[in-house]
Amino acid sequence: MVRAVAVLRGDSKVSGVVTFEQVDQNSQVSVIVDLVGNDANAKRGFHIHQFGDNTNGCTSAGPHFNPEGKTHGDRTAAVRHVGDLGNLESDAQGNIKTTFSDSVISLFGANSIIGRTIVIHAGEDDLGKGTSEESLKTGNAGARNACGVIGIAV
């Protein structure tokens, strides 16, 4: 079992922890999300970005992690960036506590997310279904509310 964790912070009031667990390189990754400070009852884009660099805040994390050069899509789409994790939805208090599994990201090999940055955005991800060219790159999810580098955990 490999376990990785990211502590998210940013210029907004959003903060929290995202944990990733994978039994072996052939299994799905469990993603455990615990975030606070979001707007109430809101959907927010959730992506893994290319770089583990937060020296200039979340901006220096670069674009979505996309080693296969695909267009943007939903977490469940056949065509998507490796880093596309769709939307998270907050409750009436602005908290997000959820767990899901993903078979595209990995804690092993070429699609490893270790050392990259996880970002929660200020807006809802249109999942690549918008009318602008930006939709196919970012999902028009807006500013980067909070982020954290994904590191190996015990």
Curated annotation (Swiss-Prot):
A Pfam family the protein falls into: Sod_Cu
EC numbers: 1.15.1.1
Entries under CDD domains matching the protein: Cu-Zn_Superoxide_Dismutase
Cofactors required: Cu cation; Zn(2+)
Listed GO biological process terms: cell redox homeostasis; intracellular copper ion homeostasis; intracellular zinc ion homeostasis; removal of superoxide radicals
Binding site for Zn(2+): 64, 72, 81, 84
Sites where the protein binds Cu cation: 47, 49, 64, 121
Disulphide linkage map: 58-147
GO molecular function: copper ion binding; superoxide dismutase activity
InterPro entries, alphabetized: SOD-like_Cu/Zn_dom_sf, SOD_Cu/Zn_/chaperone, SOD_Cu/Zn_BS, SOD_Cu_Zn_dom
The keyword Phosphoprotein is annotated on this UniProt entry: no
Binding site for substrate: 144
Compartments, record wording: Cytoplasm
Catalysed reactions, semicolon-separated: 2 superoxide + 2 H(+) = H2O2 + O2
Co-factor: note: Binds 1 copper ion per subunit. Binds 1 zinc ion per subunit.
Class of enzymatic activity (EC top level): oxidoreductase
Subunit note: Homodimer.
UniProt similarity note: Belongs to the Cu-Zn superoxide dismutase family.
Biological role stated in the UniProt entry: Destroys radicals which are normally produced within the cells and which are toxic to biological systems.
Protein name in the entry: Superoxide dismutase [Cu-Zn]
